[in-house]
């Protein structure tokens, strides 16, 4: 029987990984718009998965608010992705934001890895901002569902997009008000304040090609670290 010197066996190579985050409108979407955005989000997730090996670690980060957040959460879970849910408050407090859809929130939370920001209602905007920035710091591409003009103040979609652009996190911009192809925002210079669609940002087929190249580049880097729990991010939430 052949023998092997186990002292010469190195550690297994890390699995390739990719993380998709979300920021976007919380308003109610009509069925046609919701269907279109769900399709566009699914196309991005499928593009990522098709570009990486079958053993890749695929993660979606969503705070699970009504609207955009849940579109990504549902699409990711339907494809077998791991869902991470950074929450601005403890779930019992956060549920007050959407009294009509608490059951849908709980259903998603039960299938996610929840993380809680150490925030409270007395500093709600700071907590929303912290959750949004956590998503940006821990994703490889950020989906932004935004109409291009609404300003939500601190922690809103426009502010989180600016934060992502400054951090050079690619933004996959989907417009809920127009059936246009996605725009890929690649750098801070392509966004002004308030953010607006740059004329030179790739869209449609060109954006998808650049996305595939972006995903492929992750194969040459170390695996993504676990979510950053430093700073405002607190403990792992369980048992709800």
Give the label of every model feature segment.
Residues 218-240:
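Basic, amphipathic N-terminal segments
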Residues 201-212:
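Intrinsically disordered, low-complexity N-proximal targeting/linker segments that flank membranes
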């Amino acid at each position: 029987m052949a023998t092997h010197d186990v002292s010469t066996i190195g550690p297994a190579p890390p699995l390739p990984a990719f993380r998709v985050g979300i920021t976007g409108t919380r308003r109610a979407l009509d069925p046609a718009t919701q269907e279109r955005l769900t399709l566009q989000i699914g196309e991005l997730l499928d593009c990522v998965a098709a570009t990486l090996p079958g053993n890749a670690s695929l993660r979606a980060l969503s705070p699970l608010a009504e609207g955009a957040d849940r579109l990504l959460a549902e699409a990711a879970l339907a494809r077998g992705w791991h869902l991470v849910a950074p929450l601005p408050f403890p779930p019992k407090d956060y549920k007050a934001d959407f009294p009509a859809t608490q059951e849908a929130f709980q259903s998603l939370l039960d299938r996610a890895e929840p993380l809680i920001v150490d925030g409270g209602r007395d500093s709600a905007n700071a907590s929303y901002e912290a959750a949004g920035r956590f998503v940006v710091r821990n994703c490889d591409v950020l989906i932004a569902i935004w109409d291009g003009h609404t300003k939500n103040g601190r922690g809103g979609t426009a502010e989180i997009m600016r934060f992502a652009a400054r951090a050079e996190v690619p933004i996959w911009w989907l417009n809920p008000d127009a059936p246009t192809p996605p725009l890929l925002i690649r750098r801070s210079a392509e966004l002004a304040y308030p953010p607006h669609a740059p004329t030179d940002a790739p869209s449609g087929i060109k954006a998808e090609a650049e996305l595939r190249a972006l995903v492929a580049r992750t194969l040459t880097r170390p695996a993504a670290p676990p979510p950053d729990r430093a700073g405002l991010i607190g403990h792992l939430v369980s048992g709800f």
